[in-house]
Amino acid sequence: MHEMSIAISIIDAVAAKAEAEHADTVTIVELEVGKVAGVEVESLKFCFSAAAKNTVAEGAELAVCEVEPVGECEACGQRFPVAFHVATCTSCGSFKTNIVSGRELLIKSITIE
């Protein structure tokens, strides 16, 4: 379960930000997680809650915004929604595509007190 290592990394970043701001408590951590990032959101929330014990983030809400995957065609430049990891251009049918969105795992904001 790699979600625990991700949760610990998030807690480390959150704790560093809280320390830099001389804050005692973190109330909300907002994440952007791409739907093809390979992260199970419910597992991440569980792991975050466990990893936050006895830290400034204990009891903090982990708010997750899931980002839909978007592909871009190298042949025609068209952008299109991606249903799976294999993306075929919906405009020209080319297989020369890249996923340009949907793999994110970003801390978007931290609310501290």
From Swiss-Prot:
InterPro entries: Hydgase_Ni_incorp_HypA/HybF_CS, HypA/HybF
Alphabetized UniProt keyword annotations: Metal-binding, Nickel, Zinc
MF terms (GO), sorted A to Z: nickel cation binding; zinc ion binding
Protein name, per record: Hydrogenase maturation factor HypA
GO process annotations (BP): protein maturation; protein modification process
Keyword Secreted: no
Functional summary from the UniProt entry: Involved in the maturation of [NiFe] hydrogenases. Required for nickel insertion into the metal center of the hydrogenase.
Binding site for Zn(2+): C73, C76, C89, C92
